[in-house]
Amino acid sequence: MPPKGKGGKGAKGGAASGEAADKKAQTPKGGNAVKVRHILCEKHGKVMEAMEKLKSGVRFSEVATQYSEDKARQGGDLGWMTRGSMVGPFQDAAFALPVSTMDKPVYTDPPVKTKFGYHIIMVEGRK
């Protein structure tokens, strides 16, 4: 019977573990951070040129270097971004995208409009 007495204390600990497990269960669905690349262009015409290059098979990093007006030297790599650190439409799009690779990119089409311009977004990781 003593284990049951300890179980009372353990139940409280179990509830805390359950909450932690719930948080872990939620993480894979949407995650709290995404590893993002983007191509940012102020003009719609320029971002559509970049989109055509992507569709013709040019690597995302190369198109970003050529067209993006932000972080171009890193191939558009923004690194890990957390929820709340991105502007609304960009964040919504980034967390909605599946994880992709340079060889099989999945990106926003049409581009996402924010106060900064037009973004083509690609997600390389989620955690």
Curated annotation (Swiss-Prot):
The UniProt similarity line reads:
Belongs to the PpiC/parvulin rotamase family. PIN4 subfamily.
Q: Where is this region: Disordered?
A: 1-33
The record's section on Gene3D superfamilies has: 3.10.50.40
**Domain (PpiC) ranges:** 31-125
Pfam families per the UniProt record, alphabetical: Rotamase_3
Q: Where in the cell is it found?
A: Nucleus, Nucleolus; Cytoplasm, Cytoskeleton, Spindle; Cytoplasm
| GO biological process: one example | rRNA processing
Chief localisation class: nucleus
Keywords, in A-Z order: Cytoplasm, Cytoskeleton, DNA-binding, Isomerase, Nucleus, Rotamase
Catalyses: [protein]-peptidylproline (omega=180) = [protein]-peptidylproline (omega=0)
Listed under GO cellular component are:
cytoplasm; nucleolus; spindle
This protein's gene is called pin4
- Please tell me which top-level EC class this enzyme sits in: isomerase
- Molecular function terms in GO for this entry? DNA binding; peptidyl-prolyl cis-trans isomerase activity
Give a short account of what the protein does: May be involved as a ribosomal RNA processing factor in ribosome biogenesis. Binds to DNA.
What are the EC numbers? 5.2.1.8
Question: What is the protein named?
Answer: Peptidyl-prolyl cis-trans isomerase NIMA-interacting 4
Which SUPFAM superfamilies is this protein grouped with? FKBP-like (SSF54534)
